[in-house]
């Protein structure tokens, strides 16, 4: 059976050029980047090159890039570090109801253990947060606002420029989890007034276990761990040289291909959306119809259980998701889908389909042809069991 991978929001295949670049590091560069002899300096040069590649992709200075173990660590460093840096001055955090658990769970932990005031702003039924709602939630004690650029489940894009302008006017640090969007869409910190941005290599055909946090010059972020003082003391620990090289190469490739790939994937996305809505009764598109990631088609299919649909599609050769891969084993409906105002029973039928570089027209045709049969089977099984 030929497999069709349609879960690129969960992770992407490592680009062969990325894998080869990493293999060369493992094979030829044994040094520690902190060492002053030749082997160490060779490793340091590779880390510096990757830092330049990441910075160039988002319009930043290399000195503003901090390497991490991934998006979750970047989110934690942003929230915990920014709030700790302003402890005693301001203690408020504002975020939205559809953030990734790396933000929401961190915010809850800070509220419980660090006496942070935690405010959650609701989103509209299409997943967009009104900038006016963020403005209304900010008060004199607000230290940090965290709003993701693109939602990992429904693909909705947020108006970061407007929100950032509000934060800047109010003297509030602004963080955005851009894990899903950087690499797929243009993201330029020279035009978006954002202070902290989280990135993750494996979302744009790089390796798992490495990411970065953009820290705008002048933004205060306290370190969350102690040790050797790497990354200018912000993220101490010996650098993952091969992973960082992979991140840099993946970012360069994504930037080079972004324009044509985004347009191609958006066309495939729209074919999936139109096909599913036309052929699957009681299917509802989730997220904004146009302000969404170019590769994301997400739905609620009433009368189904998302996990059952995913497993049935798996048997037919398709890899899709019923939501975030980080919570796919959870039997509770997605907090993101519930935040859209969709009732709990319907929310159990969420389905996320995300295309990628390797997705073809034939793949999309096959998926659209298969899904209605799978949904009928799942609904029939559920009716018999009821």
Walk through the language-model features, giving the residues of each:
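Pyridoxal 5′-phosphate
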Residues: 1-386
């Amino acid at each position: 059976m030929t497999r069709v991978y349609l879960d690129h929001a969960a992770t992407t295949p490592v680009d062969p050029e990325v894998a080869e670049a990493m293999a060369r590091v493992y094979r030829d560069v044994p040094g520690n980047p902190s060492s002053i002899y030749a082997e160490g300096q060779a490793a340091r040069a590779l880390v510096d090159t990757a830092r330049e590649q990441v910075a160039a992709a988002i319009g930043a200075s290399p000195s503003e890039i901090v390497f991490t173990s991934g998006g979750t660590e970047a989110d934690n460093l942003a929230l915990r570090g920014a709030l700790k840096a302003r402890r005693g001055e301001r203690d408020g955090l504002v975020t939205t109801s559809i953030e990734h658990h790396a933000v929401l769970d961190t915010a809850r932990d800070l509220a419980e253990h660090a006496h942070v005031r935690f405010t959650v702003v609701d989103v509209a039924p299409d997943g967009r947060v009104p900038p006016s709602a963020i403005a209304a939630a900010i008060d004199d004690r607000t230290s940090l606002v965290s709003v993701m650029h693109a939602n990992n489940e429904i693909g909705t894009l947020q108006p970061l420029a407007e929100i950032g302008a509000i934060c800047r006017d109010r003297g509030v640090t602004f963080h955005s989890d851009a894990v899903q969007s950087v690499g797929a869409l243009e993201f330029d910190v020279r035009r978006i007034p954002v202070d902290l941005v989280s990135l993750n290599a494996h979302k744009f055909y790089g390796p798992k276990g490495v990411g970065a946090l953009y820290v705008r010059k002048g933004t205060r972020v306290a370190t969350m761990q102690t040790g050797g003082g790497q990354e200018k003391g912000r993220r101490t620990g010996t650098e993952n040289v091969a992973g960082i090289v992979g991140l840099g190469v993946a970012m360069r490739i994504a930037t080079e291909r972004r324009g044509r790939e985004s347009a191609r994937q958006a066309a495939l996305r729209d074919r999936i959306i139109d096909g599913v809505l036309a052929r699957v009764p009681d299917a509802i598109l989730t997220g904004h119809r146009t302000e969404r990631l170019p590769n994301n088609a997400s739905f609620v299919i009433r009368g189904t259980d998302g996990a059952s649909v995913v497993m049935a599609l798996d048997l037919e050769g398709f890899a899709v998701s019923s939501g975030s891969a980080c919570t796919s084993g959870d039997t509770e409906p997605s907090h993101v889908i519930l935040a859209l105002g969709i009732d709990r029973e319907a929310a159990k039928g969420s389905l996320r389909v995300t295309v990628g570089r390797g997705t073809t027209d034939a793949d999309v045709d096959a998926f659209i042809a298969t899904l209605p049969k799978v949904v009928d089977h799942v609904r029939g099984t559920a009716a018999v069991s009821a």
